[in-house]
Every structure is written in C-alpha cells, then in structure tokens.
Amino acid sequence: MQTTFFKQKSNYWRVFALCFFTAVLLFAPHCIVDAVAGGGYFHYAGDFNDQQINFYQYANAFVKNGGSFSWATDLGSGFVNSYSFYLLGSPFFWLSMVVPARLMPWAMVPLLCLKMAVAGGGGYLWARRWVRDETWSMLAGCLYAFSGFSIYNIFFNHFLDVVALFPYMLAALDDAVIDDKKGAFPFWVALNLVDNYFFFAGQAVFLIIYFFCMAAGRRYELGLRKFARLAWETALGCACGCVLLLPAGLSLLQNPRTIDPFSGYGYLFYGKSQQYGAIFYSTLLMPDAPYFKDLFQEGILKHTSLTAYLPLVGVAGGLAFCRARERHPFTYVLKVCVACAFVPVLNSAFYALNSSYYARWYYMPILVLCGATCYLLSRPALAEQRLPRALRLTTFLTLTAVVFAVVPGKDDDGNTVFGVLDELARFWAIFGMTMLGIVIFALLWHFCRRKRRWGAILTAAVLGFSLLYGSLHLSLTKYAQWDVDSNLIAETYDSVEDVAAALPDDAFYRIDAYGAHNNLGLWFNRSCLQFFNSTVAPSIMAFYPEVGVKRDVNSKPDAENYALRGLLSVRYTLVAKDKETEWTDKDLPGWQRTGETDAYALYENENWVPMGFTYDCYVTADQLERVSEEERAQILCRAILLDDDQISAFGSLLEPLPDEELTNRSEDAYAADCAARRAAGVAAFTATDTGFTAKTAYDTDELVFFSVPYDDGFSATVNGEPAAIEKVDDGLMAVYVPAGENEIEFTYHTPGLKVSACVSAAAIAVYGVYLLGIIIKRKSQPGSKR
C-alpha cells in the first residue's frame, strides 16, 4: 500500500539547509581562531589533525597521479587496503576530488558541514514515515545530525560519512517492505557497503535487529515472495558494493588487530565495573573530548565514541515513548540495543566479535531514539501524559552525576579530598551545559507546548543549543591541545616546499621524525618511520614487534633503537626545533646535523644503507630469540633471518651466523655492519607507483634483501622471468638473483581487487537491467502511483 505521508510536500531541502548552516555557524568561530592565531586552516585535535587532513590531501594527489603502491604509507603499503577504511569508498571523498590536493585542508570544514546536512536530511526522510508530521520529522533529522555521537566524531571525521548515509538505507528498507517499493534498497546497501566495510558489518547486524523488531511489532508484514525479493535486493546491493570488501577482507584476515576474540567471562562482563557507569551516563551527559576520561577513570573509555546524547531533549522523550508504546517496534529496538550495550559479546557483534571495546554503532539506535522522541512530541495528548514524569526522571539521573564531584576520598598523602574527578572545571562545564539543556527544554515545554508553532520553536531551540554545546565540546577538545597543535601547520603544510628543497633527491631513502607530528611522510611524500594508520600492510604489524616496536594503531620506533634506522634505510631525521636539545641529549651514534628549515633541524645518518643489499650470513629464529627484541635490529643488519626451508634453498649462498656474533652489539660493530651492507648494495634502486625496480651486478648468485613489507599482492621478475619472493626478517622481502647483471622488478596488484571489481561491475549491470524491468513494468501499469 502507499502511505499517506508521501503525499505531503517534502521538506528535505529545508532540513538540509538548516543543518548545513547550523554546522557553518558551529565551525565558523574556530575557523576564525585558526586563521588568526593557528596558522591558517581549521585544525582540531588527535586523529583529525594527524590522520584525516593529511589522508584527504595525500589520497587526493595519489588518485589523480595513479598507482597501486604507496611508499609514503609507513614502510610502504598497498594504497587501496590502507585507505579504504578511511576514505576510498566515501562519496564525500570522491566529491572532494574537484578540489586541488594542495587546497584539501581548507575543504575539510565544508565537507563536515555537508555531512551533517546529509545526515539531517536522511534522518528526516526516515522519520517522516513514523512521525507523520512534517515539523516534528524535521526536528528528528536535526536531532540526529547534531547528536552527541555526531559532534564527538568530528574528531574522527570519516565516521560522519557513515552517520550521514545510514538513514537513507533504513528508509529504503521501510519503503521496500511496507510500500513494496522496488529498486532503491540495493543502491543504498551498495553505497553504505562501499563507503565503509567495517561499519557496514555493524549495520547488517542492526538491520537484522530492526527487521525482526518491526515484524514483531506488526509493522512489517511480508509473505514469502516479498521476503525473497528483499533477500534478492540485499544480495544484489552487497554485490554491487563489494569492490573494496574482498581486498580489505584478505588484508584484515592477516591483521592481528582484527583477530582478538573473547574468552571466558569476557563474553559476559566488562573487565572494569566503571565501564557500566560510563555506558549509563552516555545517554545523559553531553560528551567529553574523545581523548579525556571524566567521570570514570577505569575501563576502555577514550576514543570509543561512547555517547548517545541528544541535544536539549536528551533521553526523556525516548523514556516516555517506551513507557507509552511498549509494543511499538521502536521500543523493541531500543531495548535490544540497551542489552547489546551492556553485554560485551553482544556489543562486539557489531564488530565481528572482536573483543576491543567500541561504541561506534550507537548512531543507529540514536536514529531510532530521535524518531521515538519526535513521535511522542507530535502527539500532544500522549506527550502531556508521559513526558513530564520522564523529564523529572532524566533530571534526577543527570543530577546524580554531581556525586562524582563531592564523594569523599583520600589523596596520595592520606589527606581527605572531595570528588574523584581529575578535572573538576571540565566536569562542571559539561554538567552545567547538560543541565542548561534540561532547564531550557523544561521551560519551553511549560510555556510553549500549546502554541501553534511549538514544533518550530523546539526545532529552533535544538539547533541553537546544538551551537552552544557543540562549541563547548569543540573547545574542550581543540584548545586542550592548543599548545601541542599550535605549530601543526608550520610543521606540515607550510614545510612541504622547505623540506623538499632541503632533502636531496639523489636516491631512494626513508626519513624519520622526532618530536614532530604524525604522518609527516604523507606531507613530504616519503616513507617515514613515524606513521599513524591502522590498516597498513599486515606484515608491518608482524615485523615491528619482533624488533622491539609496539605496533597497534601507529608505528613509533624509539629513537634509541638506532640500528633499526640502518636496517630500514633511514637517511634523515627531521627534528622539531623545540625538541632539538632533547634529541642531542640522547647522543645517538652516527647522526650529524646537516641543515635546517624553519620548522626542523635535519640530521643525516652516517650509517645510512641504501635500499637493496645482500648479506654474507643468515641467522635462525632460534638464534634471534636469544637477543632482546630491542637489539635484534643490529643482528639483522649483520645477517638475514631465514626459516628452515629458506636455509635449505639458499644456505649455499650464505654462511650461518656464529653464535658469538649474537653478543657483538657495540656501536662500532653496528657501523661496520652498515658499511658492509652498503658495499653489498644493488647497483640501482627506483621506487615506482606500482612497486620498485632494481639493478644488480654481483659476481656470484645472491639473495637480495629489500626492507619493503611483504605482501601477497607483489609479484617479481628477474630479467623478465617470474621470480619467487621470499618472506624474510619476519615480514620483509628478498629475491634470488644469479651472478651478473640483472634487472629486478616488483609489481604490486591489490589482492582480490580484480575479482571484486568484476563482481561489482557484473552486479551493477544486473542492477541496471533490474531497474529497467521495474520501469517498464510501471509504464505498463498507467494506473499505478508507484
């Protein structure tokens, strides 16, 4: 059947404009601050500064230049797998391709405003079916666009892509099941999948919950035929959008961060009791900065997106709705989601049962909460009956947070203190803003609820309050790191030309950084040891821990691990000038100051070993395990690590490393090892957009080592003939070459991309035929309104 709300004039573009210009007003003051005192474009904190700005700038240039292998990504990684989680499937990223790469930092705020506008419009489109009143449906969209989840995740930026697109898929599902509309659902499934495969896994779980709750609430009534068509459209949409899924899946299966299952009680209970308190208050208080802990100090709280706050109205409308409409599907959905939030294994179901805690799926029940709130408010009699009590309960529960500021305790010296909070001022700001919202809502309810334009008044108040609390959140997050990030632009964007002029371009080499910001390699288009990206080549994750470097979300080898720099062909370290004294105090061997830029002192590595060299000896895994992880790099400068099969194949080319050499780890020995590796270097090495080439001219057969992360996507040829690639040193590469002059070529093709692209292309063709069939059928039924 065709529902009546579609006959009403859509206010989509009004909601879009309201959300867009509210976002403009939200960011404008902070953009002005950055223009005047921050060095230029808007920068924020943490991931936004260290990842999102430079990812967008770098990916923009990389896509336009073409290629498959990114040398500037850590030690080198496949471009598709490194950036598909962050931006490569995002329609907002592809829209930004009209902007020159050099101007991308200035495009970040307009893109954020656009995402919030798209989110608001999508929330409105989904809500208007259920709310059945245009004004209140518009409010639902605005609440969704400026929820605590949206404001919090400005920090991560690309999470907002998911927030923006999800409501359209949910609305298309409703249309397909309730109104028997065909054709739209596969499109939105495909777009959400290609946008972000990680979040899509959670969306699939939520859609299943939503579907069964709708069926249980008798809003979804479908027979076998309609169910089969829905299954067909779902599969078709997944096939259309799988272009990045297979490559990502093949990579993630090798990534240790994605394989972290629960055990025992971990399935049922969080390890810290305070986690439950943090989840509970996430619906009541506006969110704190992502990198702070406020009310609770124990548990996994930072960077988890743990917030379900709605501006001004809070959770009161949702509580009242659930009491008033106990058998409504929204009530079922919200109750199931609450259960999921408090049970670890259910929470992790949105992340393929990974035991790492995140709340990054909350935007989906938040959308339902917005719909439930506006459903209640659009029915005056129902709201009059249920809302006051829920508002009083919400007020009381919010006030209980004060306990954390006054509860008595003891400090480290045994003195009596009040409160368990580290930053009282920050807490009172958050608590005060939250209570201000409750008071404003209560006053508006008391004085305006019977006015004819009550919905418009409340919408204006929600948008106005979103500016207030959103600006407070931005300020708490941004300016708490002002001293750290005030030189961000000077060390990155403004230093591109200076660094390019200061560094020689006579050979391939890596750089390192000390006391500087993350991901300098992306700005300067060079491989840099300090790198912040969760989805780099999996072999990097395997290699670094074996040489004493923790590798989780980023690579940060300590400067004291100086031998690692020789092994990985690091020629220069860029030392931030305000950290130069700290650097020189370390007195690391082999570094000489050779120049400077406005932001950096340049130190050259006297023990630099150009990329590509051979060894005289090999070392076994058993031998290497006798050496502490932090000192293994020095042994690997002396001998290549081979497994038993490789020793059988290449043992005749190399001598086994004597055991006494395992203890010879002096600075002089390191310098001698580097000199020996330089002498055994390849004749030429050239990095390309698809891998690299090298030339050799050895007198004997050799196993040539390259400190490039091993990847199944690489294929190698020697003199045009296919050659086997050896995985050595727990994650790097080597290839056998015969004596004499040889040309080596390593070419990278993203594993699975060709297959997934073919599947997507075929599915899109099928989808086109499917749409054509729908159109022809409609035209053959002139009386149909569909």
Language-model segments: which ranges?
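Contiguous transmembrane helix-bundle modules in multi-pass membrane proteins
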Residues: 180, 199, 330-492, 739-786
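Membrane-embedded helix bundles of polyisoprenyl
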Residues: 23, 113-129, 135-217, 229-249, ...
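Periplasmic/ER-lumenal interhelical loops and adjacent helix-loop junctions
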Residues: 46-59, 91, 226-227, 234-324, ...
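Active-site-proximal, structured, solvent-exposed surfaces of multi-pass membrane proteins
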Residues: 647-786
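Active-site lumenal/periplasmic loops and adjacent helix-entry segments of GT-C-fold
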Residues: 29-167, 191-195, 278, 289-301, ...
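Hydrophobic alpha-helical membrane-insertion signals
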Residues: 5-81, 480-499, 503-518, 522
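Extracytoplasmic/lumenal acceptor-recognition loop(s) of multi-pass membrane glycoenzymes
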Residues: 81, 85, 462-487, 499-568, ...
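Membrane-interface helix-loop-helix junctions at transmembrane boundaries of multi-pass membrane enzymes
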Residues: 220-228, 317-341, 453
